[in-house]
């Protein structure tokens, strides 16, 4: 489970643009269900992102 403050990267489950492929994001809010999908909000990312499309980094 992801928590506020966790560092994450987008994995290959969904399409990821070249700009975001290696970028490390910080979880700012969530998780919450959006349209039936569990999502979190990320710093410097517009909108929320599906939890299963993210991998936690150390």
Which residues fall in each region the model found?
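Basic/aromatic-rich interaction segments and small domains that mediate binding to polyanionic partners
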Residues: 7-57
């Amino acid at each position: 489970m992801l928590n506020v403050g966790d560092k994450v990267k987008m994995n290959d489950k969904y399409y990821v643009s070249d700009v975001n492929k290696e970028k490390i994001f910080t979880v700012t809010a969530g998780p919450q269900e959006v349209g039936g999908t569990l999502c979190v909000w990320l710093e410097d990312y517009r909108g929320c992102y599906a939890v299963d499309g993210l991998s936690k980094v150390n």
